[in-house]
């Protein structure tokens, strides 16, 4: 998880309220989110739904917008407090009338109407706090930055498609002090507003890596601890596994399960017993069960 960014060079013009302003332009390292104070001591104000910044931030609801801007949205006082506790700094903090302002350090503090928050988030009853953060830079998400022995357990998920489920998995990884979450293949965007919302702030505390299936197989081949796949026809009940540290827990989606290459690359294949009529549990539930099973076994 990167918490520092590149240096600045030049600027591009933006509009906050009715007053043009200069907004720092980053180098390739990313956007700023760790400065010592607000750039402006007095907050700006935006009420117009046609303000250029509203359009710019609204684009962050789309994957294309996040890729182009390398930024993402996070909302809610609790989530932003978690960001602050993890050492993150926002580019912008947008605050509704009457809401507390200092929930997270930010380069720009902007007072906005509820209508502006509704426009940006697409929600009828938006949270009174909305912040814009730089995504971690590419180097921090490369497997070269992964230190397997820095944690006793890790979570690998193949092709998760539902942002709510993925957000819950990230939250469970945080709750169990997992070293990080490795997303394999065609995964949904962990920085979508829906996923970030589901993490309840854990997005700021958990390392997230994105890899191809071949990269995941290669990682498992050299993994120094136990790698445990989950499957309905697993050869051993999950409670019987020692989860030798550092343990890599590898799960697939409810609909498709794990691909054969990933399953074959793991040292163990565990099953989660289905005792009733249900054939499976969803991704987030399975991840939570296995993460806590590993935590208990490793005590």
PLM regions with names:
Residues 112-113, 158, 184-185, 207, ...:
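Short beta->alpha connector loops at strand-helix junctions that form conserved
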Residues 229-278:
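Active-site/ligand-binding-proximal alpha/beta "capping" segment
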Residues 72-74, 91-97, 208, 226-231, ...:
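Short, hydrophobic beta-strand segments that form beta-sheet elements in well-ordered domains
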Residues 76, 161-169, 280-286:
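Amphipathic alpha-helical repeat scaffolds
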Residues 31, 137-234:
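RNA substrate-binding interface of SAM-dependent RNA methyltransferases
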């Amino acid at each position: 998880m990167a918490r520092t960014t590149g240096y600045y060079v030049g600027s591009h013009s933006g509009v906050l309220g009715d007053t043009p302003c200069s907004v720092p332009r980053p180098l390739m390292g990313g956007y700023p989110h760790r400065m010592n104070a607000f750039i402006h001591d007095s907050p700006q104000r935006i009420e117009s739904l046609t303000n250029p910044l509203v359009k710019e931030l609204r684009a962050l609801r789309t994957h294309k917008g996040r890729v182009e801007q390398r930024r993402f949205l996070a909302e809610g006082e609790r989530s932003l407090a978690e960001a602050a506790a993890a050492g993150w700094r926002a580019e912008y903090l947008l605050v509704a009338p009457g809401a507390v302002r200092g929930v997270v350090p930010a380069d720009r503090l902007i007072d906005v109407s509820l209508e502006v928050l509704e426009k940006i988030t697409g929600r009828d009853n938006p949270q009174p706090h909305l912040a814009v953060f730089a995504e971690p830079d590419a180097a921090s998400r490369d497997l070269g930055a992964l230190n397997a022995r820095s944690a006793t357990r890790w979570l690998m998920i193949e092709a998760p498609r539902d942002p709510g489920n993925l957000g819950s998995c990230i939250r469970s990884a945080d709750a169990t002090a997992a070293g990080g979450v490795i997303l394999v293949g065609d995964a949904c965007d962990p920085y979508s507003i829906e996923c970030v919302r589901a993490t309840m702030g854990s997005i700021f505390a958990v390392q997230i890596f994105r890899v191809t299936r071949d990269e995941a197989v290669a990682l498992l081949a050299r993994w120094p601890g136990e790698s445990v796949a989950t499957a309905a026809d697993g050869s051993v009940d999950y409670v019987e596994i020692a989860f030798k540290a550092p343990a890599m827990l590898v799960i697939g989606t409810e609909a498709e399960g794990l691909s054969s290459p990933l399953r074959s690359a793991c040292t163990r294949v565990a099953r989660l017993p289905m005792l009733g009529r249900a054939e499976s549990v969803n991704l987030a539930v399975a991840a939570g069960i296995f993460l806590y099973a590993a935590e208990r076994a490793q005590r």
